[in-house]
Amino acid sequence: TQTRLENIAKEGAQVDIQEMNYDDCVRLAAKEADETPRGVMVQDTAWDGYEEIPSWIMQGYGTMAMEAGEQLKEYGCERPTHIFVQAGVGSLAGAVVGYFSNLYADSPPAFVVVEAEAAACLYKGAAAGDGQIRIVDGDMETIMAGLACGEPNTISWDILKNHVKVFIAAPDWVAANGMRMLGAPIKGDAPVTSGESGAAPF
């Protein structure tokens, strides 16, 4: 959106809105980084030949999972039965699933990955049942803009295909309902302001 563009530009960045989908924008940025002296691509999705930086970013996402695990313990929850996490390329989901799979190695929770229906590349890969990546292309129109990614992170896919119990391709109304429920919860629960992508698993 224009507001996001302006906020990023205030930090001194050159910002463009392109008439292409997320995955094509990633390819364009990688090309420009290659052609720029001392250019470095910093991106959380991985592909063959570009794995180191995405793995560092996933480790950062893993810190959030670690903090959540510590809070669960503080509240007396020894092991959650289910863990829901949203996915675009799957980097965050891979980090969360990887962390909790190791934390509860003897009896892992049931992991549920929620994607935007219009960009459900992980769901399609899981449904195919052959362990191979599936790609979704085109505009991938959805209100869950942060999840409108059609090409999985290759590192994450290796984790997710082996540990996730359920993949969900969620229509937009699921995210809209999630936002409403988080913003106006049942009595006693604190309200949470969330965007569409963050609310998708709820």
Each language-model region and where it sits:
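PLP-dependent amino-acid enzyme catalytic core
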Residues: 1-202
